[in-house]
């Protein structure tokens, strides 16, 4: 594995051997193991924010009061709000950007202006498609394997061929859990610098549509 990867796992049969390898055998202590079964709890999220052995903490920017027990356990997906939001951006674009950011469907803006808003009525996901913007320079620095169709390109031509954003569909999904939000937060903040892996134990319901 590359340096400082993050492994999402879910079952004891996967997690305990990984912990043993790090704790006892001192193998790959730069790898961060995140058990999604525990990631719904505030104490575990706090642990994951902190460095462990040679691995930095997970890129989670949340304050403790935003993930404490009983907060944001489930957040409703409300795509019907898109019409109102888009109407606001058409009629009052400056006010809309001040209220919800340049792209109201970017995950960072959804968390900031909706999920973690002071007003309880804003604690929803106002779309069925979430956007994560791609730092193209970071992608190229990472050395990751690019799609075969663009591998032959060079320079600006290659950079232009990389999509501007990653869109994740929430179609037919009515609720996101705290764990779902956590994974989206990590994906948005990794910036192609820390590779993400999922153990085979992670069920489809825990993957959103990452695969």
Predicted regions and their residues:
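ER/secretory pathway lumenal C-terminal domains and tails of membrane proteins involved
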Residues: 1-4, 16-211
